[in-house]
């Protein structure tokens, strides 16, 4: 690896901070405030450069908006029959099919199909507070340090998981609350199978919980469905499919999920 890519090397070896996605989202949300402050306070050469950059951005945005509005121009979807009358030059293009409208409608149709494909049984779930999710662990000789946290919900850690050294482990995932398999129900076949979990795709509570593998109600998990014998249109065996957890694993002691088909 080149010497100047030490940041990428560190990310590959140690990963990112647990709250990286949250910090990134907040930084993007604050960007508008920073731009407004710079526009008011920058003086001299830096102010001129900033104004020039903002001007070019606004011009590009106006062009983009204008192009988007032109794509919505209504026109005849089918050309009229030729009745033998001559048309003036400025009316000749009105007989052509409006391709922009056709492209726009096809994009909307694809979006609707995609939304229908990835619709889930539980679109909304109740939020979980950090006080309920994490338990504070007191450490140190006199038990005065409180930088450690223990997850009180069920988690999935994977096969090759090894704990960090005790002195460096900030978040503890108890062995008794780790799950490896789930009771997955196929909605069309109406059967329930005990399938191994491959990974946690998305936890609706927070990206940090997704990275930690926390299993709560509404979480999307990937399960091994090779035992069901599902095949694709090309004849290949389906290995993993997504499922959504429909129960509270920490209350029931098991994971129940519905397969997303």
Swiss-Prot record:
- Name the protein family: Belongs to the eukaryotic ribosomal protein eS8 family. Ribosome biogenesis protein NSA2 subfamily.
Record GO biological process:
maturation of 5.8S rRNA from tricistronic rRNA transcript (SSU-rRNA, 5.8S rRNA, LSU-rRNA); maturation of LSU-rRNA from tricistronic rRNA transcript (SSU-rRNA, 5.8S rRNA, LSU-rRNA)
Taxonomic path: Eukaryota, Fungi, Dikarya, Ascomycota, Saccharomycotina
Q: Which UniProt keywords apply?
A: Nucleus, Ribonucleoprotein, Ribosome biogenesis, rRNA processing
Q: Which CDD domains does the annotation name?
A: NSA2 (cd11381)
According to UniProt, the name of this protein is Ribosome biogenesis protein NSA2
Statement: the UniProt record of this protein carries the keyword Transcription: no
| Location(s) in or outside the cell | Nucleus, Nucleolus
Q: How does it assemble?
A: Component of the pre-66S ribosomal particle. Interacts with NOP7 and RRP1. Interacts with RSA4 (via WD repeats).
The UniProt entry annotates the motif Nuclear localization signal at 15-22
């Amino acid at each position: 690896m080149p010497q100047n890519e030490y940041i990428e090397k560190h990310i590959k070896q140690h990963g990112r901070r647990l709250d990286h996605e949250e910090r990134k989202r907040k930084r993007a949300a604050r960007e508008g405030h920073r731009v407004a402050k710079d526009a008011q306070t920058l003086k001299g050469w830096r102010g001129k450069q900033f104004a020039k950059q903002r001007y070019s951005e606004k011009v590009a945005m106006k062009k983009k908006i204008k192009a988007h509005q032109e794509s919505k121009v209504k026109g005849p979807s089918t050309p009229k029959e030729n009745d033998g009358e001559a048309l003036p030059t400025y009316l000749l293009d009105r007989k052509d099919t409006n391709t922009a409208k056709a492209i726009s409608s096809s994009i909307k149709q694809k979006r609707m199909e995609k939304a229908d494909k990835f619709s889930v049984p539980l679109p909304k779930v109740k939020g979980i507070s950090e006080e309920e999710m994490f338990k504070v662990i007191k450490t140190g000789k006199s038990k005065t340090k409180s930088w450690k946290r223990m997850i009180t919900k069920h988690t999935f850690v994977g096969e090759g998981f090894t704990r960090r050294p005790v002195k460096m482990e900030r978040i503890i995932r108890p062995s008794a609350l780790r799950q490896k398999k789930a009771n997955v129900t196929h909605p069309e076949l109406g059967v329930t199978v005990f399938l191994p979990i491959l990974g946690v795709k998305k936890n609706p509570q927070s990206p940090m919980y997704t990275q930690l593998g926390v299993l709560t109600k509404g979480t999307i998990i990937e399960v091994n469905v090779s035992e069901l014998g599902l095949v694709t249109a090309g004849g290949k065996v389906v290995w993993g499919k997504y499922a959504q957890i429909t129960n509270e694993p920490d209350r029931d002691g098991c994971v129940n999920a519905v397969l997303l088909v």
